Amino acid sequence: MTELVLIMVSAILVNNFVLVQFLGLCPFMGVSKKIETAIGLSLATTFVLTLAAMCSYLVQQYVLKPLDLEFLRTISFILVIAVTVQFTEMVVNKTSPLLYRVLGIFLPLITTNCIVLGVALLNANKAEFTFITATVNGFAAGLGFSLVLVLFAAMRERIAIADVPKSFQGAAIGMITAGLMSLAFMGFAGLIKL
């Protein structure tokens, strides 16, 4: 139980996949203009990350390793992620058509979000991970992504109404804000040693 809590805290705060490992920067910068869109994408991405972590672990342990096909790991994980995203897209379309329309092109683009493939590959590289720990790591990575995305969207909404100098408007102030946010998360660096 303690190990699972440490994995959660590590993936959410200490080794955040967006701010520390720089995975998932495209949706981080692209979808973070409105908090509603950021919440919707973060929920969908967390769902996909959790399912992809589970499925990729099962594919790795019960298909690729026994058949000595580990060199096909990246291709097989991309297929698993594509299927997971299609499933998520169908679920979101059925449960919340408004959210489906708001997310638009960003929902299918979760397939190409490098955080999803990165978590699957990092889980596969950790030999000590079990099915439960891989699933918890995927879920925690999604929570960490969600936390950062929603916080960044809230800051960008406030910056949009602030008096920002013309040379810093747009992407420049976004990058500065992301950098300061990354520095803030560096404060968690000594919290956990795995």
Swiss-Prot record:
GO cellular component: plasma membrane
Domain of life: Bacteria
A Pfam family per the record: Rnf-Nqr
Keyword Signal tagged: no
Compartment(s): Cell inner membrane
InterPro entries per the UniProt record, alphabetical: Ion_transpt_RnfA/RsxA (IPR011293), NqrDE/RnfAE (IPR003667), NqrDE/RnfAE_oxidrdctase (IPR050133)
Transmembrane segments: 4-24, 39-59, 71-91, 102-122, 131-151, 172-192
Main localisation: membrane
Enzyme nomenclature, EC number: 7.-.-.-
Keyword Cytoplasm appears in the UniProt entry: no
Keywords attached to this entry: Cell inner membrane, Cell membrane, Electron transport, Membrane, Translocase, Transmembrane, Transmembrane helix, Transport
Membrane topology, from the record: Multi-pass membrane protein
Gene Ontology BP annotations: electron transport chain
Enzyme class (EC, first level): translocase
HAMAP family: RsxA_RnfA (MF_00459)
Family listed: Belongs to the NqrDE/RnfAE family.
Subunit structure: The complex is composed of six subunits: RnfA, RnfB, RnfC, RnfD, RnfE and RnfG.
Protein function: Part of a membrane-bound complex that couples electron transfer with translocation of ions across the membrane.
Protein name: Ion-translocating oxidoreductase complex subunit A
Annotated organism of origin: Ectopseudomonas mendocina (strain ymp)
